[in-house]
């Protein structure tokens, strides 16, 4: 009689194509409780073992169906999912060594399921990853675009599916993302300009010719960095205190291309007095060229990102300074905003930035960068961004000790 009075079949059984056959079979059984009940009544005496066997199968069916339905459920996240797309591993080591690590820790601490992937500089892969994340149920995407065109395509697709997008570190011009999380990138550039001026003053340089080795031409951050350092150095060019030298962007922030470009700069202007390199990778490319001419340490070179390589170049005196951007703070801020939006809460910004292509102000969470010279390299180590063990290897052990790296 159990089969006449008890409905063991749930109302909602299937979630996904892999369950289709199982679901059709189970629903067919669910529609015939009376028939099943009569069948078992007539054969109750003979089929007790059979009933137990079918009951066991029913439990197995229900367990399998439950697993199908819970594939996308987040622990502690109210069902929300967050997708993060990092740009590459080539333009800077930070994306894999810092951003991924800190973002993962922040999401795990909040109990939010997040999918963090890297497009490895491939525009098609970037779009494919975004499509997969949306299909898999992400309610928030946090992207670091490869260029504004790639970013816009993802943002438009996400909007059409009701998915919120956060621009992380790089603003997608004309994209219309409702939030942007980054450092004050104009200030990053200003610190580079001020840093080069300090280094040239320390060297007592007279009318130095200054070259610009700018970042990728399609990266809005590269534009902001240049706005910052040009704001410091242009008045010096205009007054005649400094002379403006070669000025060239490096496609896709490619360090190999940067080396070639700078070699051509140095060949055409052998009396260069200083170099604004837009990050540590480009700076190291310039330093490698200068080493060939035994000019390293004589011509100040800037950078930013406070990479291990950049900090070692600073300690060695080959790079005059770098800019430390506390990536953990940026990752934590991005994760906090993404989690709030995924939970249906209102996101909070502390500033706005201009999107000249959209002629709009974008709500932003902006963080403060810090200039790093030889004397305060330890600040980066003390903050945990790099370790003494990875920085102070081989020949750099003594340089670390001499400069107070603990």
Task: Describe every region a protein language model picked out.
Residues 4, 17, 36-43, 49-51, ...:
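A residue-level marker of the well-folded mature domains of exported/periplasmic proteins
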Residues 2-9, 13-14:
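Extreme N-terminal basic, low-complexity initiation segments
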Residues 23, 27-66:
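Sec-dependent bacterial lipoprotein signal peptides
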């Amino acid at each position: 009689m159990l089969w006449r009075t008890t409905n063991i079949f749930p109302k909602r059984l299937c979630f996904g194509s892999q369950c289709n056959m199982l679901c059709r079979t189970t629903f067919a059984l669910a529609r015939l409780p009376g028939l099943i009940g009569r069948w078992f009544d007539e054969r109750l005496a003979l089929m007790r073992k059979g009933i137990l066997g079918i009951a066991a199968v029913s439990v197995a069916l229900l367990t399998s169906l439950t697993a199908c339905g819970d594939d996308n459920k987040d622990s502690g996240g109210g069902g929300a999912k967050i997708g993060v797309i990092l740009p590459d591993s080539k333009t800077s080591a930070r994306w894999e060594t810092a951003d991924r690590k800190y973002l993962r820790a922040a999401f795990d601490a909040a109990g939010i399921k997040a999918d963090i992937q890297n497009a490895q500089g491939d525009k098609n892969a970037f779009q494919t990853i975004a499509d997969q994340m949306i299909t898999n149920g992400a309610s928030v995407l946090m992207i670091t675009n490869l260029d504004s065109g790639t970013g816009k395509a993802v943002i438009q697709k996400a909007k059409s599916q009701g998915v919120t997008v956060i621009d992380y570190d790089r603003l997608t011009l004309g994209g219309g993302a409702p939030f942007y999380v980054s450092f004050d990138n104009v200030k990053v550039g200003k610190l580079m300009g001020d840093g080069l001026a300090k280094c040239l003053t320390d060297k007592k340089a007279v009318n130095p010719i200054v070259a610009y080795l700018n970042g990728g031409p399609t990266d809005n951050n590269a534009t902001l960095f240049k706005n910052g350092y040009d704001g410091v150095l242009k008045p010096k060019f205009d007054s005649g205190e400094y002379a403006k030298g070669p000025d060239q962007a490096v496609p896709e922030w490619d360090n190999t291309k940067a080396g070639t470009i700078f070699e051509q700069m140095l060949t055409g202007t052998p009396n260069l007095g200083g170099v604004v390199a837009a990050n540590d990778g480009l700076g190291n490319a310039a330093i490698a060229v200068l080493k060939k001419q035994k000019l390293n340490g004589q011509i100040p070179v800037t950078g930013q990102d406070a990479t291990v390589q950049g900090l070692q170049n600073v300690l060695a005196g080959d790079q005059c300074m770098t800019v430390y951007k506390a990536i953990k703070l940026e990752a934590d801020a991005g994760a906090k905003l993404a989690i709030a939006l995924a939970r249906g809460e209102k996101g909070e910004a502390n500033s706005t930035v201009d999107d000249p292509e959209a002629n709009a102000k974008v709500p932003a969470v902006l963080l403060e960068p810090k200039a790093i010279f030889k004397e305060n390299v330890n600040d980066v180590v003390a903050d945990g961004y790099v370790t003494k063990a990875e920085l102070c290897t081989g020949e750099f052990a003594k340089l670390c000790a001499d400069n107070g790296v603990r």
